[in-house]
Amino acid sequence: MNKLIAWIEKGKPFFEKISRNIYLRAIRDGFIAAIPIILFSSIFILITYVPNVFGFTWSKTMEGILMKPYNYTMGIVGLLVAGTTAKSLTDSYNRKLDKTNQINFISTMMAAICGFLFLAADPVKDGGFSSAFMGTKGLLTAFISAFITVIVYNFFVKRNITIKMPKEVPPNISQVFKDIFPLSAVILILYALDLLSRAIVHTNVANAVLKVFEPLFTAADGWIGVTLIFGAFAFFWFVGIHGPSIVEPAIAAITYANLETNLHLIQAGEHADKVITPGTQMFVATMGGTGATLVVPFMFMWLTKSKRNKAIGRASVVPTFFGVNEPILFGAPLVLNPVFFIPFIFAPIVNIWIFKFFVDVLNMNSFSIFLPWTTPGPLGIVMGTGFAFWSFVLAILLIVVDVIIYYPFLKVYDEQVLEEELGNKEANNELKEKVSANFDTKKADAILATAGASEADTDDTSSVDETTSTSSTDTISEQTNVLVLCAGGGTSGLLANALNKAAEEYEVPVKAAAGGYGAHMDIMKDYQLIILAPQVASNFEDIKQDTDRLGIKLAKTEGAQYIKLTRDGEAALEFVKQQFNN
């Protein structure tokens, strides 16, 4: 098993390169920007259709009133994502351009939205246009519009093809004329594509694209498709790669289209049979976090003999219940641990097989409601599928099955740890260092340390490689703003908080903030230093183009080093100081 994992890790650079692809990243970040709209609209689905389960049905008039906010938000999500995706892709292209010759992201957003209307909207007799393909049905077309828009803009801006204005003309006026050529080219190209589609296949581009990808959508919803998709999430995470960065952009259009299709099927009184949805990913395949780990902390707490494992279980129960499973992933650890390779990969797959059986054979409705990913898995299953009877059975069954899958491997691992404890050996040092080098383990480490489950020696927190100094914090004399970036923005808060606390204690002019990689472009100019957490350290060369252009210092950290910095605020301040001395 160790040889298998070592062989798998050899492919890590290739997959990391895929995860940094600017087009995949644009899709992911475009969706992230639209999440508030999607969450808001789902509230009205719950209000409108959940009462049906209890025998209460709204009148058609009231149903129309309640669903209007949904139709006017989620109903145009394709239109909105065209703009947000274009904005994200524009940021990526601007990294490669001279700082005095940048693409105007506001212009690309407007052009992508206008172009999307050409590709997805049909005129209606009374004026205006149909919105049938402006929602999730138009997502693939939204990506096409965004990509073509930014590529065309890059062509014009890079070659400085523009209407040149005298230097006396204000910059905002010059920008208007600079955008005329690329915007016109985008509209004409996408309009020509629309005319071509209507002439050849007699429908708009959005509908034509859906027809082309329909077999793929069907295949993805099949047994092999769901196995590959949800197995990949766990596989990539196990070997140290942020799986969602690779898998989610590839299936985003399918999942959200299926979610809306399921809703329409329920509205029509039919069976909602589309399996691949956001809820399937969040509450079935990754119930309790990647690896379907909801049951694992409870098993560590109740079914192990090792004191260390019991402590880790107690510390991990609450966060894992809400889908934050870093404490058990990195505390046990589960990832990069040969003992847990099989259950970590196959528990999500078995979960999705059971769910598909319930949908296909028992005629249970699939997910039709979008819920926050922090919703506890069993509750997410019940709420997301409309409180159906079978959803309660499914939630209980998945818990039982996951316990059965993990149990034999847990016993093997517990015996290993127990033997080490009885022999006064330091447990799994090599494995823990490997995990720290491959993952951003700061959140897990902090939670475990607080709960008394960490085995880290206190001396570790006072020797942060080359960053410790007891007299250097007073050398930072000017106001220094620091931005800490991680994959999602949540866990980077630990280092930011450590810096702020130490800065206040030692009266050092340092202010730190946490953020997520991909959402940093608009705010990074306000900082003098950006620190990359280990999870996003592979993006160092990409972001360095931005920081060099803006005159900002950039630093990346490794796993063990980062953990120690989050524990020792003084060492974190010294780390900041050293970046300006290098």
From Swiss-Prot:
Transmembrane feature ranges: 30-50, 64-84, 103-123, 137-157, 176-196, 222-242, 283-303, 339-359, 381-401
EC number of this enzyme: 2.7.1.207
Main enzyme class: transferase
GO process terms (BP): carbohydrate derivative transport; phosphoenolpyruvate-dependent sugar phosphotransferase system
Induction pattern: Induced by lactose, galactose and galactose-6-P. Repressed by glucose.
Ranges of compositional bias, category Low complexity: 464-473
Membrane topology summary: Multi-pass membrane protein
Function (record text): The phosphoenolpyruvate-dependent sugar phosphotransferase system (sugar PTS), a major carbohydrate active transport system, catalyzes the phosphorylation of incoming sugar substrates concomitantly with their translocation across the cell membrane. The enzyme II LacEF PTS system is involved in lactose transport.
Active site residues per record: 486 (phosphocysteine intermediate)
Modified residues (Phosphocysteine): 486
Domain named PTS EIIC type-3: residues: 8-409
Protein name according to UniProt: PTS system lactose-specific EIICB component
Any single Gene Ontology cellular-component annotation: plasma membrane
Species, as recorded: Staphylococcus epidermidis (strain ATCC 35984 / DSM 28319 / BCRC 17069 / CCUG 31568 / BM 3577 / RP62A)
InterPro entries: LacE (IPR004801), PTS_EIIB-like_sf (IPR036095), PTS_EIIB_2/3 (IPR003501), PTS_EIIB_3 (IPR013012), PTS_EIIC (IPR003352), PTS_EIIC_3 (IPR004501), PTS_IIB (IPR041713), PTS_Sugar-EIIC/EIIB (IPR051088)
